Amino acid sequence: MRDIGSQPAAGVRSMKVRDRALEIIRERISRGDPLYDFTGLASRPKVDAASDELRTYLSEALILPEIRELCREHFDAPEYEVLVAPRTTAAVIATILALEPRSVLHVLPEDGEAHPCVEEGCRLAGAEYEEVEESEIPDLDGFDLVVVTGCDVRWNVVSEDTLREVASAEAVTLLDDASGDRVRRLHGQKPGPRYGFDLVVTSCDKLMDGPRAGVLIGRDDLVEGVRRVCEGYGWTVDGPTLAAVKRAFEEFELSSLEARLKELERVYERLKDELDVERTGAGLVFHGVEREVEIGLGLLRRYGIMTITALGYERVDRTLRFNLLTEDAERFGYDRFVEVVKGELS
């Protein structure tokens, strides 16, 4: 079990890197230079609603019921309740606080990297935290809550066998499907509730044109408990956010991602013999790269390529990686991307 602690020095360095990246973005915008999202996070949320629908309380009355039905259809879970949170991380932490578990198991895809929110939620709740890859799953009877990461920060995808095994546990089960809801489906898997998970959460900005909000869908009694925690901490969303969430689910089409997945395969084939590159569920991860942060900042400065390496928050995995399923990756051009990466990393 890993020790839970803070790393203030690393945090300061992360903020300085991110501040520099944001400065470069401002400079490019002021010159009229383009920017391209290779993070999978910089979506283009759309707000389309009458002014009254965007007002506090009115938006909950008018828009939230539509979101509920859209999400039930999207997740193929007609009996589940729906909650919109300001962030997926807020929904995850609120779930842990609501359940007050004594022990939590966090299951990652093989070679996966964990988002820190599950561990942080356990620290706040005073729960024991254990983190394993899917090949190392212990006896699930010893845990009150089991969390599975459907697709990790490098877009490694969990197996269906693991989803079925965990969903059948006696413990409460949560599928953290931030980008996994889209990435897993691209690789032939089903929506989280179809495996029997009690709760599933996804991010509306990851490979969807929605706001940076999280949607939690699950058993009525559990979602109601999470809702109370979110409201108690002020983790609620406003009318424009609800309108953008609604539009994101209305307009989502898997077919556009399927076409880009074919381009990802083609790009990988062109790079694999020249660079130490790994193809994952949604992009490419480059290994053995020195000065990753400097390269990430350089790509942003010269080409407008936005990466997590340059723009990530504290405790983020800064391994150089590119999500090639974004609309911006297509707009940048896959052939151009190959030449740029070869020039920067060869």
From Swiss-Prot:
InterPro entries, per the entry: PyrdxlP-dep_transferase_arc, PyrdxlP-dep_Trfase, PyrdxlP-dep_Trfase_major, UPF0425_MJ0158-like_C
Modified residues (N6-(pyridoxal phosphate)lysine): K206
CC cofactor: pyridoxal 5'-phosphate
GO molecular function terms attached to this record: L-seryl-tRNA(Sec) selenium transferase activity
Keywords: Pyridoxal phosphate
Record-given protein name: UPF0425 pyridoxal phosphate-dependent protein MK0620
Originating species: Methanopyrus kandleri (strain AV19 / DSM 6324 / JCM 9639 / NBRC 100938)
